Amino acid sequence: MSKVIAVCNQKGGVGKTTTAVNLAASFAALEKKTLLIDMDPQGNASQGLGYNEMQDVDIHEILNMADNPDNITYDNIKEAILDTSLDYLKVITSGPDLAVMEIELVNAMSRERRLERVMNVLKQTFEFIIIDAPPSLNLLTLNVLTAATSVLIPVQCEYYALQGMTELFKTIREVQKNLNANLKIEGALLTMYDSRLSLCKQVAEEVRENLSDTVFQAMIPRNVKLSEAPSHGKPAILYDVQSSGAQAYMKLAEEILNKGK
């Protein structure tokens, strides 16, 4: 069965997009048919896979099309599904137009379910669909959580790591109650970890204490190759497969696969 993982944290700068791109690339490297959907109007995930220009058909067009469920067939949306440098990885890009979608959806019928309609079609083709959610708790994020089977939460190893998590978990509970009863927590992922810093170790312990079993064993280190890769339009695994960042995301992908067995 297809898995739709929303990478979500309304707090910026926690490694959300880095995680979405590199987890998707890792699944693809493991020969899983994978799709990355960029739902962030900033379009950084698209850029991280080499798509710097706005595309003729992107996620904004697809969500508009999904106003009428009958429009959503694979043939109608395949133009938006683009190739990447990895055979098993495709992407649906985003751009600034997506920010307008928030206003367009306000008075729309079933406004939280647009992406879910699209997902019902895409799940028939892909084993893993990774969604890079917007860095805010808005209607676009509600669409993401309604369409997802699980949520992965990146948590930066810094002093205010758990700040804002209460709000995110409250939103997830509301979605579970009203829109998507099957939504699960895939796990919390510690990012930007530096074993030389006692603060990082302290925060990692605190996060594990607070979130216990939901925290992944894999931790993403602070790594220069992870920072450089997007400017080359590549995931870390293609930029430097031996880097600690690329290896950490591969471990994360394997952990998720093993958990599902």
What do the PLM-derived regions correspond to, one by one?
Residues 1-261:
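P-loop NTP-binding core
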